[in-house]
C-alpha cells in the first residue's frame, strides 16, 4: 500500500527535503486555486453523512479552507482534485479547534491532510473517508525543541515518510514527532466536537507510538480522556499511520 501511495505521489510532484523551522507568511492563492474555491463556496445547508466511514456517502459536503491563521491544507493538487470536503459539523469542529490552538499553541502551524469527496464515496486509496466524518492530520514535528516544517512542504509525498517507534524521522533522527501537540489537539477536538453534537469515534496512529503519545502532560490527560485510540492494526495499516493521525467522528 505504501508503495502504491509513493507511485501516486511521484506522479504529482518531485521529492525534496527543505530545511524550514518557521513557516513563511501564507502566499496568495494561485488563480486556479482561487477559482476553485469560488466555484465551491460553502452554503448554509446542513451536511448529511450517510452510511459508514468505510461504506457511505456525503450530502451537502463543505470545502475546508485551503489556509487559515494557524493551519493549511497540505497539498494543492489533492485540494483541486476534490479531496478536501467534510460534514459541516466536522468542519466547524476542526476550525473551532484551531481557533483555540491559536492561544494554547501560538507558535505552531498545523496541516490538514485528506478528507473526502464532495459527495463522499470511495477516496482511493483510503479504506475510509467515505461519508465526511474522517480526517487525516499531519503529525506536527520538532527539531532542536522548536516547531519544524521542513517536511511539511512535500504534499502528497508526506504519506510516504517513515518514523521509528520513538517518533524519530528515519532519515534524520533529530526530527521528531511533537506528541504533546497531537495530544492537546485531540483533547481540543473532543471538546469542540461535543458542541457540534459529535464525538471522536476513534483515532488511528501507529500503535508503537502510543507510549510516546501518552508520556507528556497532555498525553496523560489524553489517556484518561476516553478518546479511543486503536490498540491493534494490520501490519499494512499500522505502517501507514506514523506520519499522520486519522480521526473518525460520529454524530450523537
Where are these regions (language model features)?
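N-terminal secretory targeting signals
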Residues: 1-57, 61, 233-235, 250-252
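Catalytic cores and adjacent binding grooves of peptidoglycan-active enzymes
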Residues: 20-29, 146-252
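Active-site acidic/histidine clusters and adjacent loop/turn architecture
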Residues: 42-112, 177-194, 199-200, 204
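Short, solvent-exposed beta-strand-terminating loops
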Residues: 46-55, 60, 139-151, 212
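Extended, low-complexity, intrinsically disordered C-terminal regulatory tails
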Residues: 93-124, 202-232
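Envelope-exposed proteins and targeting segments
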Residues: 106-108, 131-135, 241-245
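Soluble periplasmic/extracytoplasmic beta-strand elements of cell-envelope proteins
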Residues: 111, 134-140, 204, 246-248
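Acidic/His-rich structured neighborhood in mature extracellular/periplasmic domains
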Residues: 117-168
Amino acid at each position: 500500500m505504501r508503495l502504491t501511495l509513493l507511485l501516486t505521489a511521484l506522479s504529482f510532484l518531485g521529492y525534496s527535503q527543505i530545511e524550514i523551522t518557521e513557516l513563511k507568511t501564507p502566499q496568495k492563492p494561485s488563480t486556479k486555486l482561487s477559482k476553485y474555491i469560488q466555484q465551491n463556496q460553502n452554503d448554509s445547508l446542513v451536511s448529511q453523512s450517510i452510511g459508514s466511514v468505510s461504506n457511505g456517502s456525503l450530502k451537502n459536503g463543505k470545502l475546508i479552507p485551503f489556509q487559515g491563521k494557524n493551519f493549511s491544507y497540505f497539498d494543492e493538487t489533492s485540494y483541486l482534485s476534490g479531496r478536501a470536503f467534510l460534514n459541516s459539523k466536522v468542519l466547524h469542529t476542526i476550525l473551532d479547534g484551531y481557533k483555540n490552538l491559536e492561544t494554547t499553541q501560538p507558535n505552531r502551524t498545523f496541516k490538514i491532510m485528506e478528507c473526502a469527496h464532495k459527495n463522499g464515496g470511495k477516496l482511493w486509496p483510503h479504506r475510509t473517508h467515505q461519508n465526511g466524518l474522517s480526517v487525516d492530520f499531519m503529525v506536527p514535528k520538532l527539531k532542536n525543541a522548536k516547531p519544524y516544517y521542513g517536511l511539511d512542504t512535500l504534499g502528497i509525498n508526506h504519506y510516504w515518510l517513515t518514523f521509528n517507534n520513538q517518533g524519530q524521522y528515519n532519515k534524520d533522527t533529530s526530527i521528531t514527532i511533537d506528541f504533546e501537540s497531537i495530544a492537546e489537539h485531540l483533547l481540543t477536538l473532543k471538546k469542540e466536537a461535543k458542541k457540534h453534537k459529535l464525538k471522536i469515534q476513534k483515532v488511528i496512529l501507529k500503535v508503537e507510538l502510543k507510549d510516546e503519545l501518552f508520556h507528556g502532560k497532555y498525553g496523560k490527560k489524553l489517556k484518561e480522556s476516553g478518546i479511543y485510540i486503536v490498540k491493534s492494526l494490520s501490519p499494512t495499516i499500522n505502517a501507514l499511520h506514523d506520519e499522520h493521525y486519522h480521526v473518525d467522528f460520529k454524530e450523537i
